[in-house]
Curated annotation (Swiss-Prot):
The gene is araA. The keyword Cytoplasm does not apply. This is L-arabinose isomerase. Keywords: Arabinose catabolism, Carbohydrate metabolism, Isomerase, Manganese, Metal-binding. It comes from Cellvibrio japonicus (strain Ueda107). Belongs to the arabinose isomerase family. The lineage of its organism: Bacteria, Pseudomonadati, Pseudomonadota, Gammaproteobacteria, Cellvibrionales. HAMAP family: Arabinose_Isome. Catalyzes the conversion of L-arabinose to L-ribulose. InterPro entries: Ara_Isoase_C (IPR024664), AraA_central (IPR055390), AraA_N (IPR055389), AraA_N_sf (IPR038583), Fuc/Ara_isomerase_C (IPR004216), Fucose_isomerase_N/cen_sf (IPR009015), Lara_isomerase (IPR003762). It catalyses: beta-L-arabinopyranose = L-ribulose. Pathway: Carbohydrate degradation; L-arabinose degradation via L-ribulose; D-xylulose 5-phosphate from L-arabinose (bacterial route): step 1/3.
Amino acid sequence: MKVYGDKEVWLVTGSQHLYGPGVLKQVAENSQKIAAGLTESSLVSIKVVAQETVKSPGEILAVAQAANSNPNCVGLILWMHTFSPAKMWIGGLRALNKPYMHLHTQFNAELPFSDINMHFMNLNQSAHGDREFGHISTRLRQDRKVVVGHWATASVQQQIDSWCRVAMGWYESQNLKIARFGDNMRQVAVTEGDKVSAQIQFGYEVHAYGLGDLQKVVDAVTDEQVAAQIETYKKDYEVSPAIFDDEHQFQMLKNEARLELGMLKFLTDGGFGAFTNCFENLTGLTNLPGLATQRLMQQGFGYGGEGDWKTAAMVRIAKVMSKGREGGSSFMEDYTYHFGAVDQVLGAHMLEVCPSIAAAKPKLEVHLHTIGCRNDIARLIFTGKTGPALCISVIDMGTRFRMIINEVDTVNPPQELPQLPVAKALWEPRPNLEIAASAWIHAGGAHHSAYTQGITVDEAVDYAEMAGIEAVVIGADTTVRSFKTELRHNAAYYHLKDGV
């Protein structure tokens, strides 16, 4: 079974009737072999299914319509084995509402120089057939991924898998529902946004619920369910002995187990893949969920604090895109700085950082929480894994959306942080904190982000391209001057692109 189960990508091969039944039979056989090779590859995380070779405008339109209506098809790989006149593709490409990747490949890797003849030349025409197809895609102003190289090589298969993961992210975006418990943190700007515009742009729905709706489900959780959940905690984490020695702390842990099980039922029953809450809206709940939120993220749900539904969506989408990979994804906040020989950012939040990014087995402890509400709250404490990561922020610009991506390198803290009982990660932004923070602020990036070690910069940008939004990258080569120029150019482009 592939990572993404019954989801699939269709390989659609273009040709034309001109070549006759013999060539078309060989084209079909080769397409089946390529699809089978990709499906069997350990580098490709999704099933690739070859469709019948399309040879006319009607056949192209039919396969586009079939893809649109098939719930398991998340995207198409298009390839011209022979020459396929591109005017035939206009109707189908305009009708297609799922993403496609243009695979510029050839069935054979090498030319049989001593034996090559015109039959071989007629059969293997992707070198110019794909150029014809590329022309009409550009003429139609369709954004798409182009992957070039022999289909059987590891490099090409990795690129194909990367795109397939983005297609899965886009599929999730189209079907995602986000539950908002309460509202945004009062007077905060960046967590606001136009939810109707977001649904039009990204596909996901945002639904608001009063705390009473959640409270009913939480209160219905039984003591037996809570006891069983605490046994799970004992297996998964290093639980502080003080919790079981202190009746008050043990009650705080039981509160958290009840919150987790109640929220899980609410989200599962409602078909939600992400959620938000706010420490200013807790009426009816025992406390701001800490451990509960962390565990729900670990189970795959997206989360955004203080009502930040855009970040909640991005965390969920990053988790879907990175399924089966080593790196985790979490809600995160740029909390405080270390100005030293190398400037660093300490990322954390009040409680809600996902243990999928933990470097070691998390500790489960109860500590006093003093922001917004004053409660002892159970939470997981850990430090993030070292290595490359991304901080991704999606913001509402008023008339459009922008994605800001900062490449960072997560490092080990130089000392222990015994007085900081929260999950955290310490990172060094690329190219450095001075430039990265300046660029981020110029771009209007949020103080929250989707922090991920599971997807690449190219995958984040490809997702933004599928969504039709601006993406700007702050990385090793960024300068503030060039970045500001890019923002100005992008402002003009995105203002004009749909009308010129």
